A protein has these predicted regions:
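Active-site loop segments of alpha/beta catalytic cores
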Residues: 1-40, 46-49, 61, 72, ...
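Residue-identity detector for glutamine
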Residues: 16, 62, 66, 102-103, ...
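A short secondary-structure junction motif
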Residues: 45-46, 89
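Short, structured active-site "lid" loops
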Residues: 50-60, 67-69
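Intrinsic-disorder/low-complexity, polar/charged segments
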Residues: 54-56, 107-111, 124, 176, ...
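Glycine-rich, N-terminal phosphate-binding loop and its surrounding beta-alpha-beta segment
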Residues: 62-90
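A contiguous, low-structure linker/loop signature
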Residues: 79-120, 143-144
Length: 355
């Protein structure tokens, strides 16, 4: 009889490891969670288009990728336009890449007052893809792996209802109408989160268009933070720890991250030492290998970068998750991602010696 794979001989399984982190206990090692989303399609030999339009295909791809890389969580995610599409925006579907905005539903910002919330129970748009994927992943691996579900946050959804550039101009010229669109986006986000929680998923808010690479700190404070805070308050009623992911530059908005109410912050382009010093006493940090490194570097360089990341943040006071700063690129080197996970597990030990 063959011995079980080494990753199954660890003291804790991934779900136990994440659970200890979330109750402020020290797990056996750092949670290793590269954001493997559309890249999973390449491992399963399925088109990206199928994984974002078929729940079963998404789940099959996630399971195949996790078996291959041995990372610590599964990810249910298609694209940030999911809610905007359900509210009427049109997306353009590509065979081997994620959908992109083709036509926002709002030609003028004032039209936001005419938009209505779809009936969540009818699973508008592609919501059924999410629910089917969550249910299948829970059946197949939910006892040992957390099933993370990426929920587009209100600011990002609002921008995709209007068109990002137009919406940013609108925040200056007609903030009142922008807040009406944000309120609708917030309520639609809650509806999707409810469905995903009821199916068994763990929500993670994703707000890429609220990045300091896109908007100013003032716009973040005025138009993103209030809705993230209300979303966090809502999820806390479920007794969930709130995960928030904002890619791109984060340093200019770190002051506002605390006010979002999140419990875990997934960061991208920011010094982990700075992140740790500013928010690490209150918020668990998730990060932050540059996704492009998985395309451009060698496995040996990835190992050195993981070592540096862990040196900077492994002992963050509230806790740390080793992750990529954003989604793993579709064409990422498999050898590089294997090196990332392997080195994270080896150097991320808290109990006893390194593997």
């Amino acid at each position: 009889m063959r011995a079980p794979p080494k990753h199954l001989l660890e003291p804790l399984n991934p779900r136990q490891r994440m659970s200890l982190l979330l109750i402020d206990e020290v797990p056996d090692r750092v949670v290793v969670y590269p954001l493997v989303t559309a890249h999973a399609a390449t491992i399963a030999g399925i088109s990206v288009r199928r994984t974002v339009t078929e729940g079963k295909s998404m789940a099959i791809a996630q399971l195949a990728a996790q078996r291959y890389y041995k990372h610590d969580a599964l990810s249910v995610f298609s694209d940030v336009g999911l809610i905007a599409e359900a509210l009427g925006s049109k997306l353009y579907y590509r065979e081997d890449d994620v959908p992109v905005l083709q036509q926002p539903v709002l030609e003028h910002v004032e039209q936001g007052q005419d938009l209505s919330l779809p009936e969540a129970a009818s699973l508008p748009g592609r919501y059924e893809v999410y629910i089917e994927a969550i249910e299948m992943l829970l059946r197949e691996a939910g006892d040992i792996l957390p099933v993370m579900v990426f929920i587009p946050a209100p600011f990002t959804t609002a921008a995709l209802l209007r068109g990002t550039e137009d919406f940013l101009v609108d925040t200056l010229l007609d903030p009142e109408s922008c807040h009406r669109i944000l309120e609708l986006s917030f309520k639609a986000g809650l509806d999707l989160a409810d469905l995903c929680i009821e199916a068994g998923g763990i929500p993670m808010l994703v707000d890429p268009l609220a990045s300091a690479s896109v908007i100013s700190p003032k716009t973040f404070d005025d138009f993103a933070v209030p809705y993230l805070k209300r979303f966090s308050d809502y999820l806390h009623r479920y007794d969930f720890d709130v995960f928030l992911h904002i890619c791109g530059r984060s340093e200019p908005i770190l002051h506002g991250i605390r006010r979002t109410g999140c419990d875990l912050f997934s960061c991208d382009d920011v010094s982990l030492e700075l992140c740790r010093s500013r928010i690490g006493e209150e918020i668990r940090i998730i990060g932050n290998l540059k996704p492009t490194d998985l395309l451009e570097e060698t496995p040996e360089k990835i190992e050195r970068k993981v070592e540096a990341i862990l040196a900077a943040a492994k002992e963050s006071p509230k806790g740390f998750v080793l992750a990529t700063g954003c989604e793993v690129p579709i064409g990422a080197s498999r050898e590089n991602l294997l090196a990332f996970v392997r080195e994270g597990r080896r150097r991320g030990m808290y109990w006893g010696k390194e593997e």
